[in-house]
Curated annotation (Swiss-Prot):
InterPro entries: GAF (IPR003018), GAF-like_dom_sf (IPR029016), HATPase_C_sf (IPR036890), His_kinase_dom (IPR005467), HisK_dim/P_dom (IPR003661), PAS (IPR000014), PAS-assoc_C (IPR000700), PAS-like_dom_sf (IPR035965). This is Phytochrome A-2. Residues 267-449 form the GAF domain. Contains one covalently linked phytochromobilin chromophore. Belongs to the phytochrome family. PANTHER family: OS08G0260000 PROTEIN, PHYTOCHROME 1. GO terms for biological process: detection of visible light; protein-phycocyanobilin linkage; red, far-red light phototransduction; regulation of DNA-templated transcription. GO terms for cellular component: nucleus. Heterodimer between subunit A and subunit B. Phytochromobilin binds at C323. Residues 616-686, 749-823 form the PAS domain. Keywords: Chromophore, Photoreceptor protein, Phytochrome signaling pathway, Receptor, Repeat, Sensory transduction, Transcription, Transcription regulation.
Amino acid sequence: MSTSRPSQSSSNSGRSRRSARAMALATVDAKLHATFEESGSSFDYSSSVRISGTADGVNQPRHDKVTTAYLHHMQKGKMIQPFGCLLALDEKTCKVIAYSENAPEMLTMVSHAVPSVGDHPALGIGTDIKTLFTAPSASALQKALGFAEVLLLNPVLIHCKTSGKPFYAIIHRVTGSMIIDFEPVKPYEVPMTAAGALQSYKLAAKAITRLQSLPSGSMERLCDTMVQEVFELTGYDRVMAYKFHEDDHGEVIAEITKPGLEPYLGLHYPATDIPQASRFLFMKNKVRMIVDCHAKHVRVLQDEKLPFDLTLCGSTLRAPHSCHAQYMANMDSIASLVMAVVVNDNEEDGDTDAIQPQKRKRLWGLVVCHNTTPRFVPFPLRYACEFLAQVFAIHVNKEIELEYQIIEKNILRTQTLLCDLVMRDAPLGIVSESPNIMDLVKCDGAALIYKNKVWRLGVTPSESQIREIAFWLSEYHMDSTGFSTDSLSDAGFPSALSLGDVVCGMAAVRVTAKDVVFWFRSHTAAEIRWGGAKHEAGEKDDGRRMHPRSSFKVFLDVVKARSLPWKEYEIDAMHSLQLILRNAFKDTESMDLNTKAINTRLSDLKIEGMQELEAVTSEIVRLIETATVPILAVDVDGLVNGWNIKIAELTGLPVGEAMGKHLLTLVEDSSTDRVKKMLNLALLGEEEKNVQFEIKTHGSKMDSGPISLVVNACASRDLRDNVVGVCFVAHDITAQKNVMDKFTRIEGDYKAIVQNRNPLIPPIFGTDEFGWCCEWNPAMTKLTGWKREEVMDKMLLGELFGTHMAACRLKNQEAFVNLGVVLNKAMTGLETEKVPFGFFARNGKYVECLLSVSKKLDVEGLVTGVFCFLQLASPELQQALHIQRLSEQTALKRLNALSYMKRQIRNPLCGIIFSRKMLEGTALGTEQKQLLRTSAQCQQQLSKILDDSDLDSIIDGYLDLEMAEFTLHEVLVTSLSQVMTKSNGKSIRIVNDVAEQIVMETLYGDSLRLQQVLADFLLISINFTPNGGQVVVAGTLTKEQLGKSVHLVKLELSITHGGSGVPEALLNQMFGNNGLESEEGISLLISRKLLKLMNGDVRYLREAGKSAFILSAELAAAHNLKG
């Protein structure tokens, strides 16, 4: 896939490319499936994938009828696996609207008895489900069907009325109906006596604890641990972790097997092996089990009167499609269990607002279990596996974020070094020194074309081939300043075959019209190794069969002309270097002078920065000393060098006595090890949060006992980033701990404490062993707005705390999973630490707090539920967070309003452009044609301004100018037309005093930006000219010869106006000396920055009775001046 990429990256463009790739692959999947169905046993896997794979190039397959039929077949299949049965109910009447053919036998027949009408109820369309099960079972089903988050109640244990057989009922909703899968409870299995997610979570407690105990920083270790835990939990012969790469192909990155099985670790397989439709289903139904791929499927019969086809996407019984079943059989995998690993999409728009809770998700990979014999895993264990996969996904997400941070840090470091090289030896330092451009991104080679010379590094095409690529880019991608592709062949480069396998992928950025930087990559297959790829002697050629070895061979064939795809952050890094080089190339001749000026300016900034730093430091010290929360600090030796008024007040130890004492001598003996560990980690730069310890009291405070603190450690660093001490910001939780200690000492009646309205009693809620709410104290009612009677006997996970219709809505799915983990730990008797927790109260306010969970024991010491304690932030912190959220919301509202206005302006602008084009097709006079040309220039200027979404990039000088030929006459006429209405209203006369020889000169530059600048300065001049006054535009143009045919044009325009002139405050804003307080100030600053991009500037001169803007810019002459 080739991509001609604009110079600025965007998450939306990344998502749209993925979307387009997914649609293209879905069409390839559809054609493969159609070929498979037509070919039957003669299906040739390898050749079919290769033929279909050729579509994944420039000519992407279209979304046709074959694709639509295939997607319908995948989502609306009417077959299930025979290990259970299925009923579909009308949600309003609870009557059967569809059933599997084996349902009557499984649910209504009496074992070893001849069926008759009298001894069992009939099952068919319209049957009332309550007639099929015992009264308690029917009641349990009825309750579950009325539950909003019904998935959280699965599985529901029910018993058939006729046979008494136990089944797990697994319920989910689809449009207009409820689907119930019935799975028999095996004789050897101890059935779960109560529904609820917490019951299933208990089964994965050990695995979750192991995952959470892993140190971060190794994706390999995380995946190896996951497959090991799933292997032990489920008992399958093989467990693998798949990862999907950016081009959608898959790789086995972790594996564990029973002895004697062929290893698949390192296997790569084409994207088509797991179709896009299947990936979509994995996003919806995150655990998928196939008990026996050879088993005969069972048909589902539905009411013919139904106006829609039932979808079985969410059914646990959904039968595998024929091609997948054959693939499994070919690799001797009879049974499988698959868990989806769903993570946050990294290309999000950085939204951290609590009002926007849901992030875009993507399928990162799968955890796949295979067995060589039929294998059934009960639903409770599968539910536990799903929960484990969610916890695993959270850790994968953290590892991905950590990897990106490390990569970005390395790129920034390399960019800084390259920038330094450019400053010292522009531009050849980036290829002649170390590090060089190859160190910026992962590549096999790089090249630079500068002043018609070629410099090469690493594995690259020959010099003549590089020149040919540069010519091809200028011919076929001239509108793009950047280009990237993982296959030069697919991108259309004519001589791609001559490059061979050595160079397949390329990225390039154009610094100037003729100067280009290239990066090259070899084919992907060069980096791929798999132990299972070897063909064993005596084996028949299996290239035609669907098998991992065939998949690997096909994958290598597909990627032999492709490199690893270029990632978004790599393209961004190249673009940043492009901007650095663009400025460096302009300034090469005067580099020494610029370097001195920059160094002088940096020295000035350092002096100013130190003064500001001292002022800020003094203010921070004052805030720490007067803070209402305890704050203390120590040096690298652990000696106290900071002790604020609050902690002195709590401990009774004055500041003077605390200073110089070792911290470990001030804490209780029971907390020494914990504080020592926290201190050592902080001195290494690892900052722990929410650490609880006790500190001694002194003097008059000794009788009240030690103070309990929850502390966040923060490493103090010097200007060289060395750790020089540790600062501890604490919360006093003594009152809460006293309550909890007193609570734990009481055996039996706890209501006197929990239900006490004393403000010292924290918010407390609790659940029984099945996850139903059994406690909700007055403080909790006050905090959430929900009364005790409204929440009692509701499911804590889902009904009270959840992501959709819950009473207290959580921010996202990750928060929901983390809450489940904490409750699960306490329920299994493990000690839990305080964790950050947040939810939306009834009034919509977002509450942030710390959650502490304690197990509840009966007289025999068995866990009968949990108690949850919430610790709220101090009022000062809550106020600060509230102000921060308000500021973010205000900024977001303004941004939304601006986006709305820009979008609404475009529609009428398109109408104006259409009207103008229609007029151009009519008979017009010379003057009318000139007016239309002026109108067109104004419209183009407006469109360009509407595209300026990032003012900071303009202010910082990171804007690409669009160069083209133009005459100054066009610019002057268009600019003047924009201010004529204003000048006529004030009776101001505008005089164009620019010589005709100058205005008719053909120049080369960005005419629309020059037009924007001139119009802005004209408007400001008219605004500050008295009524009846005069504004005069004059200009000069000088040329310098840079070569035989190239002339540099220095243009200077003056705008002179009468009156007292532009206010000094507004001019200060133009020069960036004051904050941007007005629209005129922003306009002037942007205009000046645009002139600076044209190697120009603006001056403002005052004389008696008149003032003038002097605008300068450097352009190029398209041809020599006449005369």
